């Protein structure tokens, strides 16, 4: 059956961990002839990013309520009702065949509005521990999808992995020669950087370079460039370090790297698996329900990563792990292969297939 003219409303926003997997599915369905519309909030990253990919976006007024003050909590029910009505209006005008929720503030009201309208609702949870919105919506969803095993314990769900860019999947399939020169360390702390990496890495490189040849590509985050550059200079290490506020071409960065030091966001973990890179994971300690630790366990249990809680992280521990990897390049390569072995490479197609199936039934 042709997919020409089928319509999907995609709900995802707030962070790249929600938006980029949703974009992968949206692009795939658009190539199959689907009309794609997006539901988000005007003050989050989807407002800027989604139109760049050629998709129309509608906005509703909704913010998170978890952990907010009393007045905001009292007003929350009225704001939620208003946002559901706004989402219902979008659905009534667009008439989607299926609605896909992938996290973010807009998913809650949009998901409720979809079910009230009798439209199939598909949820996808990227993290190993479900967010509050998906946890609530899972009770009314037509189909619940997740990236990791045992994410949902109260509803039936299907494990499909996290949708990621095709370029990264292709990169992981390329043969990677055994590293025998300077250890190439990619340091990524997200778009805002990670203060702990910015604080420790200049001293780590200084200590390690006395024993090993090492080069570093360090994403320091917005407004941190001058300070981190000065710290490397004070350690006499600026020569072997490439410092950037933000790395636009992650495909090039992954291709360059031997090992990655990073947080354990769901999308990061899935990308590391897809490209087949070993990693040192430092979960963000303030993540809701400590979900990053659970995300990272997938790679740790596979023997593809080390996990160091930020509370115990120091220069000596980082030097020790990097020294270990630098001294055993065969094990470094094995860790990369183990990462690739646990990758789910067809997540985009699996999510899209569920949406297509439900649209055809409707």
From Swiss-Prot:
Pathway membership, UniProt: Cell wall biogenesis; peptidoglycan biosynthesis
Protein's membrane topology: Peripheral membrane protein
GO BP term (any one): lipid glycosylation
Annotated catalysed reactions: di-trans,octa-cis-undecaprenyl diphospho-N-acetyl-alpha-D-muramoyl-L-alanyl-D-glutamyl-meso-2,6-diaminopimeloyl-D-alanyl-D-alanine + UDP-N-acetyl-alpha-D-glucosamine = di-trans,octa-cis-undecaprenyl diphospho-[N-acetyl-alpha-D-glucosaminyl-(1->4)]-N-acetyl-alpha-D-muramoyl-L-alanyl-D-glutamyl-meso-2,6-diaminopimeloyl-D-alanyl-D-alanine + UDP + H(+)
Chief localisation class: membrane
Alphabetical UniProt keywords: Cell cycle, Cell division, Cell inner membrane, Cell membrane, Cell shape, Cell wall biogenesis/degradation, Glycosyltransferase, Membrane, Peptidoglycan synthesis, Transferase
Cellular localization per UniProt: Cell inner membrane
Any one of the GO CC terms: plasma membrane
Catalytic class of the enzyme: transferase
Its biological purpose: Cell wall formation. Catalyzes the transfer of a GlcNAc subunit on undecaprenyl-pyrophosphoryl-MurNAc-pentapeptide (lipid intermediate I) to form undecaprenyl-pyrophosphoryl-MurNAc-(pentapeptide)GlcNAc (lipid intermediate II).
Protein name: UDP-N-acetylglucosamine--N-acetylmuramyl-(pentapeptide) pyrophosphoryl-undecaprenol N-acetylglucosamine transferase
Species the sequence originates in: Shewanella sp. (strain W3-18-1)
Underlying gene: murG
């Amino acid at each position: 059956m042709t997919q020409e003219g089928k319509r999907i409303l995609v709900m995802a926003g707030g962070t790249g961990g929600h938006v980029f997997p949703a974009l992968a599915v949206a692009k795939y369905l658009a190539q199959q002839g689907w009309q794609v519309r997006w539901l988000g909030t005007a003050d989050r990253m989807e407002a800027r990013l989604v139109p760049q990919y050629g998709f129309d976006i509608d906005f509703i007024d909704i913010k998170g309520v978890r952990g907010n003050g009393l007045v905001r909590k009292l007003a929350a029910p009225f704001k939620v009702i208003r946002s559901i009505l706004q989402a219902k209006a979008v659905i009534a005008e667009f008439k989607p065949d299926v609605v896909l929720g992938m996290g973010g503030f807009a998913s809650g009201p949009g998901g409720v509005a979809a079910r009230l309208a009798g439209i199939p609702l598909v949820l996808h949870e990227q993290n190993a521990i479900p967010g509050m919105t998906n946890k609530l919506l899972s009770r009314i969803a037509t189909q619940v999808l997740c990236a990791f095993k045992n994410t949902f314990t109260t509803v039936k769900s299907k494990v499909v992995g996290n949708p990621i860019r095709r370029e990264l999947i292709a990169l992981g399939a390329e043969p990677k020669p055994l590293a025998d020169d300077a250890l190439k360390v990619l340091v990524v702390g997200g778009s805002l950087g990670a203060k702990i990496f910015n604080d420790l890495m200049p001293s780590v490189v200084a200590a390690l370079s006395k024993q090993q040849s090492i080069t570093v590509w360090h994403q320091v985050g917005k407004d941190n460039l001058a300070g981190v550059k000065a710290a490397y200079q004070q350690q006499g290490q600026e020569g072997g370090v490439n410092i950037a506020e933000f790395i636009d071409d992650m495909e090039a960065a992954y291709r360059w790297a031997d090992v990655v030091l990073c947080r354990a966001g769901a999308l990061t973990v899935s990308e590391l698996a897809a490209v087949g890179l070993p990693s040192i994971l430092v979960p963000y300690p303030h993540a809701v329900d400590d979900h990053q630790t659970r995300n990272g366990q997938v790679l740790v249990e596979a023997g593809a990563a080390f996990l160091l809680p930020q509370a115990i992280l120091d220069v000596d521990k980082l030097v020790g792990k990097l020294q270990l990897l630098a001294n055993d390049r065969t094990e470094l390569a094995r860790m990369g292969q183990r990462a690739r072995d646990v990758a789910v490479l067809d997540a985009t197609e699996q999510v899209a297939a569920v949406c297509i199936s439900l649209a055809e039934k409707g």
